[in-house]
Amino acid sequence: MDKRISPAAAITGAITLPGDKSISHRYAMISSIAEGDSRILNYSTGADCHSTLGCMRALGIEITGEGTEFVVHGKGLDGLRAPAGDLDAGNSGSTIRMLSGILAAQPFTTRIFGDESLSRRPMQRIMKPLAQMGAEIRAREEKFPPLEIHGGKLRAIDYTLPVPSAQVKTCVLFAGLFAEGETTVTEPVRSRDHTEIALREFGAELTAAKGKITLTGRPRLTGRDLIVPSDISSAAFFIVAALLVRGSSLVIRGVGLNPSRSALLDLLIGMGAKIRIPQLESQNGELIGEIQVEHSALQGGVIEGGLTAAVIDEIPVLAVLGAATEEGLTIKDAGELRVKETDRIATVVENLRRLGVTAEETPDGLVIPGRQKFRAAEFDSFGDHRIAMAFAVAALRGDGESVIQNADAASVSFPEFWSTLERIAE
């Protein structure tokens, strides 16, 4: 599907976005191995999160409901059953990486696969710690999906992440739930901590301090009533749209503002963005609030180190924004983007050039000069949801009608993206 986007006169209105993708995955998985029912409201509508539901159902978990409301009938740590066939993770790296930690502890063998894009994404980062815990995992070419996971009794380990990754951290912690003793994960740079918050919410004994997370194995997890905050990564596209287009004033309600994710807002405010958060509330251990944003002239800057890790999913749309700043934007330490749904460094640069923007690709990032004009163009999502949405935002500031090729890629995380954009773009 191709989508035509006209320049916007302004981005205005008040919107509520679908549930956070990262939190939805975690709630579905933990609810399945908790005892009793968990009611999940505002579950993500994205295809990735429904891949997780499909996998849990295949493992014998009854999940009722539809749309954004589900009840997961948990069976406890030892309640999963061997699936009748292979598990399908679709396009979801979160599903295959995090769920593998649970599968590694099961008394049966599981084969889990994904689509063509996921089949190109390396899995050594989860295979190594799980092997140390006692699991046997076979992979295509020793690193790519499908994975064949021979589960069994696991041992607790003390593991240091070689690079920051919330998915790998979660995989090890999920495996640690089934091991006797304490499993410790040390991360070089703080990554999003939704897993730690959710595990505590379900009753796990877990401590986190100075980059070290320690989990006591074999806890009794208890089902909960849960509300998923709106996804800040989805909000990022509309925040950037409002910042880019003159005369814009936008309100986004009920957004998850976990400090490990809100670095995006701190970055933008530091660049001069007119962003307000009138009040914060706590919901299932997660902070939520309303974001108010207006068109702003931004200075630009450098994204590197821990900041890069904190905004890794938002870098495609931040790259678009960088071209409109006064000083431009330099992004470093983002090599992880090379192994996302696409090589996001290459696909961002390719589409920026179509936009008429000068951009330089580096081994682990991008250099984007500022004060550049956007022209109408035909953009290609290359099947990557974040690329599709980032360049739809770019098109709002173009000098004519643009086309997003393969626009349906957005449905992986945000099926309502196009209708929401039409509602707020004047």
Curated annotation (Swiss-Prot):
The active site is at residue 313. 3-phosphoshikimate binds at residues 21-22, 26, 165, 167, 313, 340. It comes from the Bacteria. GO terms for biological process: amino acid biosynthetic process; aromatic amino acid family biosynthetic process; chorismate biosynthetic process. CDD domains: EPSP_synthase. It holds the Pfam family EPSP_synthase. GO terms for molecular function: 3-phosphoshikimate 1-carboxyvinyltransferase activity. It catalyses: 3-phosphoshikimate + phosphoenolpyruvate = 5-O-(1-carboxyvinyl)-3-phosphoshikimate + phosphate. Phosphoenolpyruvate binds at residues 21, 93, 121, 167, 344, 386. GO terms for cellular component: cytoplasm. InterPro entries: Enolpyruvate_Tfrase_dom, Enolpyruvate_Tfrase_sf, EPSP_synthase, EPSP_synthase_CS, RNA3'P_cycl/enolpyr_Trfase_a/b. Keywords: Amino-acid biosynthesis, Aromatic amino acid biosynthesis, Cytoplasm, Transferase. Pathway: Metabolic intermediate biosynthesis; chorismate biosynthesis; chorismate from D-erythrose 4-phosphate and phosphoenolpyruvate: step 6/7. Coiled coil: none annotated. Its main location: cytoplasm. It is found in: Cytoplasm. Its EC number is 2.5.1.19. PANTHER family: AROM/DEHYDROQUINATE SYNTHASE (PTHR21090), PENTAFUNCTIONAL AROM POLYPEPTIDE (PTHR21090:SF5). Monomer. Belongs to the EPSP synthase family. Catalyzes the transfer of the enolpyruvyl moiety of phosphoenolpyruvate (PEP) to the 5-hydroxyl of shikimate-3-phosphate (S3P) to produce enolpyruvyl shikimate-3-phosphate and inorganic phosphate. This is 3-phosphoshikimate 1-carboxyvinyltransferase. It comes from Solibacter usitatus (strain Ellin6076).
